Amino acid sequence: LTAIYYKSRATLPDKVRATQQDGFLFGEISGQQIVLEHNHKFLVDFVEGQKTGFFLDQRENRKLLGEFANGKNVLNTFCYTGGFSVYALKAGARLVHSVDASEKAIDLTRKNIELNGFDAEQHACVATDTFDFLKGKENQYDLIILDPPAFAKH
């Protein structure tokens, strides 16, 4: 164990957020770190990344995708780190498109695709609004991952 970083402020109500401080409880790391999940490598920024930097609650869903992606055309919307894209490519997807409105997320997805040994022939990243991208895309994909961020606070 190298470090423990406490990060909860982004998900807390404003009144509670003002009393909390994100930071290291043990050790310290900086910048992007490589993590391994089911033999897949991912660059993760625990400090500056969205929420925890990598959504661990989706790890079994990413693994499950691998059972269905072989030979398929896959669209990963709101891709963030490209986790689902990496799993689809490793499973033998014919083609994977990753879409996110954030240039930073698209850059991270590209890095994670390269980190796992894939090239641009099998994968394309698109930095645009997912809903705009989906218009007019009927029957182009066999599998679509649609895991949007929260659009409204509770």
Regions found by a protein language model. Give the residues of each.
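Non-catalytic substrate-recognition/targeting regions of SAM-dependent transferases
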Residues: 1-54, 63
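Conserved acidic residues
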Residues: 2, 72, 94, 142
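Conserved alpha-helix/loop element of class I SAM-dependent methyltransferases that forms part
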Residues: 56-72
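Conserved class I S-adenosyl-L-methionine
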Residues: 71-80
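Conserved SAM-binding loop of SAM-dependent methyltransferases across substrates and taxa
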Residues: 81-94
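Conserved SAM-binding motif I beta-strand of class I
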Residues: 95-100
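S-adenosyl-L-methionine
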Residues: 102-145
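Switch II (G3) loop of P-loop NTPases
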Residues: 148-149
